[in-house]
């Protein structure tokens, strides 16, 4: 099966309502994948996400995968640390793909585009993220993009008394002295 064509673009304020709808659905369908909860998120106005979008050159940005008809299929964020001594780090956050678009290459394309933009940010040396450890498909997706596990936080998210572990991962960027293309 060939996935439908899609394009990756930087999210801006024109995408706020589509982003909120995608996020609310992702929180409803896969609550263990996020630290935010659906009940709280649905109460947030779309405009409250505007400050997260930023601009790629700053190291804080969100990307979207768009279908040919303009529908938002998925998104991923990169949030650079604001503190001076951690400005070399950014967190990959909010990776989500609409259920009907999963396993069609959207997630892989979003991660690749995020890494490529992050590599262009002056002084940015590493990307870090957490992923639900039991979500092995997504863990493998990040590993294929060059991320490596460095720790596990047991019961990082607890939903109805059930704990979900989070795997901590890092990917060194070319600006880092620890970067190795091998």
Model-derived regions, located:
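Extreme N-terminal starter segment of soluble prokaryotic enzymes
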Residues: 5-7
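Acetyl-CoA-dependent GNAT
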Residues: 13-14, 20-21, 26-94, 98-100, ...
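Conserved phosphate-binding and hydrolysis motifs of nucleotide-dependent enzymes
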Residues: 74, 105-107, 146
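Residues that form or flank phosphate/diphosphate-binding pockets in enzymes
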Residues: 87, 105, 137
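Active-site acidic-Proline motif in GNAT/NAT acetyltransferases
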Residues: 98-100, 104, 133-134
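Conserved GNAT acetyl-CoA-binding A-motif
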Residues: 111, 118-130
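C-terminal "cap" of GNAT-fold acetyltransferases
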Residues: 125-139, 144-182
